[in-house]
Amino acid sequence: MAASQCLCCSKFLLQRQNLACFLTNPHCGSIINADGHGEVWTDWNNMSKFFQYGWRCTTNENAYSNRTLMGNWNQERYDLRNIVQPKPLPSQFGHYFETTYDTSYNNKMPLSTHRFKREPHCFPGHQPELDPPRYKCTEKSTYMNSYSKS
């Protein structure tokens, strides 16, 4: 006498077969790019998510490095650790490659690397020292609001 499977087990096996079909034939279903760390999400069925990066223990598998500039490349590029890095010294042969446009329009002085002091921040990626002064708000207490001249 053959043992019959319950409905939930047969449904699970069918979903596993669908996932195996998708992995061998990726032209079916849809592929969704995740968050730019080299991860690709496949939206095939309810079971496929458990075998993908975001549902595993770590999400850093096969991730690109920061030099690839994918995902949050703007935040990574303008991070304080990258801005404070000193620029390379000018070459002794640099004047041979200097253009008229550069001499006319790019005459900015190099910025000092010591101008950034770490300010209090509200979350790990927040960098208030990069905000221009007009966007920095000064908090006023109730006392300051009551007794200030303005």
From Swiss-Prot:
Mn 2: annotated segments: 140-150
Listed GO CC annotations: axonemal A tubule inner sheath; axoneme; cilium; nucleus; sperm flagellum
Biological processes annotated in GO: flagellated sperm motility
Primary localization class, coarse: cytoplasm
Subcellular localization: Cytoplasm, Cytoskeleton, Cilium axoneme; Cytoplasm, Cytoskeleton, Flagellum axoneme; Nucleus; Cell projection, Cilium
Region Mn 1: start-end pairs: 99-110
Keyword tags: Cell projection, Cilium, Cytoplasm, Cytoskeleton, Flagellum, Nucleus
Domain of life, source organism: Eukaryota
Pfam families given in the database record: CFAP68 (PF06608)
Function noted in UniProt: Microtubule inner protein (MIP) part of the dynein-decorated doublet microtubules (DMTs) in cilia axoneme, which is required for motile cilia beating.
Family per record: Belongs to the CFAP68 family.
Assembly and binders: Microtubule inner protein component of sperm flagellar doublet microtubules.
Protein name stated in the entry: Cilia- and flagella-associated protein 68
Organism placement in taxonomy: Eukaryota, Metazoa, Chordata, Craniata, Vertebrata
